[in-house]
């Protein structure tokens, strides 16, 4: 265990090195106080703390030269799970199956070859695979890295691959438009496995802010003026309009949130990828199994 490793001379030396570095000096605290370690976490803050601590534990294991038991988590059933109600599936037939969103490491995860094996295995088992690209990186020096990662994903997810080109809200007047993006992404692949219709330019940031605002307005009839995310929402939806003015007018806030949601272009992705995958869950499970043969 890491506690036993810490008691060795090599462990003590590693600990001293960690304590001297600003971004790693607090990693040892998770061994000194394991109160964060629970079987279940409830509420946003508890869940965030638990996941952050698990991430720190993996970093600590690597820093101390201990191999993390990635093979123990090869099955999705053994991974940490956040159980939430997905609002866009409310009211749908539960007999069609459940939706599990699995965030896998990138194909070229630096220094972690075990994660590449895990990633490929989980992608082969998935009913649908959503690759997330950064619009701002498409025409940069990182383009070749993006191309390699996308091809690595496409190799194991043919017929089940969809691509979200995120941060499309950062497009300026000289940037590629939506139609151009839909043509460019399939051209990055070595094989003809991705039709342009499965490429979705969009903004997850705008979608998140709009969806959260609409949820608050439906639930409470107003926006919580003192919460930081409301500042981001007002800035994104209304520009330089004063926050107090927006928060006092629920009809105006709802209209702005609705427009922001539509402008994010995420609705089409949810409809065509997530809802479609959910409605065809049984058939996709068979396709996924056949793809591994």
Residue ranges and their predicted role:
Residues 1-280:
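Globular "head" domains of long coiled-coil molecular machines
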